[in-house]
């Protein structure tokens, strides 16, 4: 494909790499003529009898996993899904998630990887924006029954089919019978096709779908597995949501499977549950966000569980403080790997042979020798080592644009294809990065990205709200929490009523503001805009005074 960075491919409405870059990455051996389904089949051929996946109820060999994926692919094709279709995949961590992903990969059907925490507000938005043919869900997701939501999606025309892992009645369709089809051997997906859509936290309420193509995402996975030392002896625990880029492909679930290792599936990340799994399954690798890492450290200091098998803890999603980083090896008994990554592409790792200073005080260096990183000032000029600027990047696994968002792409990507991340970083002379903050109006709550505008728009739609603005407030556990400042109409609603309203709107629970303040007015900038900077500073001073 030869489209320019800001021009959608004629095939799939997503910007692709220019021809010169395609040739560069092919010649370098980064990209291969293979899709994810073919990669799993190759791994199964090497390790047919090894256990690929296990949970509390089931253990699947590679041969069994491949057969189940191919049967489901055949069943989904019979149900009406075909190459180029889009579905919204909304499943909890589980073997069914892996089987469904690879069945869709085989068909060339593109899943939008929704998170378990997403609810009707987000799911409906994804379905409509992506023109999804189907919603694929479960009978239970973290205590939530999504089936009434699925019926509403059908009734409103947001999608045409709703397929459920578990019990389902018409108009919903149960997925279990689809596994009875004869296994599908052929593979419709091409290496250059979109494999899936990851989700961007973004800074607005518009869904931003990140098109990840088979060949570049496979490179992301394989190169990550090499850097992180994943092999057939790896036992990887999934505490974080498997739909996340971090858990899925950095190297994560798929990296483990392509290396011939074993994935231990957990729907929970709390220390009590995960420590028991680590001891029972002899887990060697796992990944956490900083708030969970802190909980694990505190729990292990008081509990002293058997974590002797654990070799590597990856921590990413937000910056891990150096004091917490220093505790990982003595408390958990394993090596720490700091990770700076984004679903749009670029991922940085501290290396397994890095000296302690690098591991404790940086978020690593880029994965690929062909990652081109610039740290720039407000005028787009590169800054020197140790200076803070915006992180911009292009490379063999960083997208060239979001799906169906040409106007946004013109702002988010430079004319020569560099992605403007909005992250403020500094870089040392050896290319290691340190995260210093964000430029974009986005809140990072324990690794989950929240677009302030999305929450603001819902609040402003409330009949008793005149105006609303949402900002981050510092938090020692999550890094950031959310605070909404609301100018009410009379009679003024209570903070509790506004939170209940947001839940009723179908907003994911992690996006509902932790704190809501009713105020008569907002501070303004010199040109009459809301000064979020002043509001953040007010919160910071208030929290410091309480400490």
UniProtKB/Swiss-Prot annotation:
Keywords: Antibiotic biosynthesis, Ligase. Pfam families: AMP-binding, AMP-binding_C. Gene3D superfamilies: 3.30.300.30, 3.40.50.980, Luciferase, Domain 3 (2.30.38.10). CDD domains: 23DHB-AMP_lg (cd05920). Its EC number is 6.2.1.61. Pathway: Siderophore biosynthesis; Antifungal biosynthesis. It comes from the Bacteria. One of its GO terms (biological process) is antibiotic biosynthetic process. It catalyses: salicylate + holo-[ACP] + ATP = salicyl-[ACP] + AMP + diphosphate. GO terms for molecular function: acid-thiol ligase activity. Belongs to the ATP-dependent AMP-binding enzyme family. Involved in the biosynthesis of the siderophore pyochelin. Specifically adenylates salicylate and loads it onto the holo form of PchE via a thioester linkage to the phosphopanthetheine moiety. Is also involved in the synthesis of the antifungal antibiotic dihydroaeruginoic acid (Dha or hydroxyphenyl-thiazolinyl-carboxylate), a precursor of pyochelin. This is Pyochelin synthase PchD. It comes from Pseudomonas aeruginosa (strain UCBPP-PA14). The lineage of its organism: Bacteria, Pseudomonadati, Pseudomonadota, Gammaproteobacteria, Pseudomonadales.
């Amino acid at each position: 494909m030869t489209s320019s960075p800001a021009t959608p491919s004629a095939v799939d409405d997503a910007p692709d790499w220019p021809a010169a870059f395609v040739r560069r990455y092919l010649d370098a051996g980064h990209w291969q003529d293979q899709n994810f389904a073919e990669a799993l089949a190759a791994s199964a051929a090497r390790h047919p009898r090894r256990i690929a996946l296990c949970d509390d109820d089931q253990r699947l060999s590679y041969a069994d996993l491949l057969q189940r994926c191919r049967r489901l692919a055949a069943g989904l094709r019979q149900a009406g899904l075909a190459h180029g279709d889009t579905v919204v995949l909304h499943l909890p961590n589980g073997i069914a998630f892996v089987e469904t992903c690879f069945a869709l990969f085989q068909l060339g059907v593109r899943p939008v990887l929704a998170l378990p925490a997403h609810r009707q507000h987000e799911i409906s938005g994804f379905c409509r924006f992506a023109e999804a043919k189907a919603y694929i869900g479960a009978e239970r997701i973290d205590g939530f029954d999504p089936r009434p939501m699925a019926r509403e999606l059908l009734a409103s025309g947001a999608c045409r089919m709703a397929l459920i892992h578990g019990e389902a009645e018409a108009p919903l369709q149960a997925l279990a019978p689809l596994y009875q089809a004869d296994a599908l051997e052929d593979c419709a997906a091409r290496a250059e096709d979109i494999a899936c859509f990851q989700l961007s936290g973004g800074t607005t309420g518009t869904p931003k779908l990140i098109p990840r193509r088979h060949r570049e995402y496979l490179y992301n996975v394989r190169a990550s597995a090499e850097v992180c030392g994943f092999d057939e002896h790896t036992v990887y625990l999934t505490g974080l949501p498997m739909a996340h880029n971090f858990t899925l492909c950095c190297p994560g679930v798929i990296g483990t499977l392509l290396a011939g290792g074993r994935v231990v599936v957990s729907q929970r990340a709390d220390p009590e549950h995960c420590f028991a799994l680590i001891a029972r399954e002899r887990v060697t690798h796992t990944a956490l966000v900083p708030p969970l890492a802190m909980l694990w450290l505190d729990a292990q200091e008081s509990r002293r569980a058997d974590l002797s098998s654990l070799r590597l803890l990856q921590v990413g999603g937000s910056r891990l403080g150096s004091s917490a980083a220093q505790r990982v090896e003595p408390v958990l008994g394993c090596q720490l790997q700091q990770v700076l990554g984004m679903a749009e592409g670029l991922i940085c790792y501290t290396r397994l042979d890095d000296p302690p200073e690098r591991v404790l005080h940086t978020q690593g260096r880029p994965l690929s020798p062909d990652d081109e990183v610039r740290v720039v000032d407000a005028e787009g000029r590169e800054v020197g080592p140790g200076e803070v600027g915006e992180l911009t990047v292009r490379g063999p696994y960083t997208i060239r644009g979001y799906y169906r968002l040409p106007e946004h792409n013109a702002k988010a990507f430079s004319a020569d294809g560099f992605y403007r991340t909005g992250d403020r970083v500094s870089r040392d002379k050896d290319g290691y990065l340190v995260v210093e903050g964000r430029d974009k109006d986005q809140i990072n709550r324990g690794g989950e990205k929240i677009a302030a505008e999305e929450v603001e728009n819902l609040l402003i739609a409330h009949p008793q709200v005149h105006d609303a603005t949402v900002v981050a407030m510092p938090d020692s556990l999550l890094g950031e929490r959310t605070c909404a400042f609301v100018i009410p109409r009379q009679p003024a609603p209570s903070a509790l009523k506004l939170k209940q309203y947001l839940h009723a709107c179908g907003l994911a629970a992690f996006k509902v503001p932790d704190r809501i303040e009713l105020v008569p007015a907002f501070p303004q900038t010199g040109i009459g805009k809301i000064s979020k900077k002043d509001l953040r500073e007010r919160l910071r001073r208030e929290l410091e005074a309480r400490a």
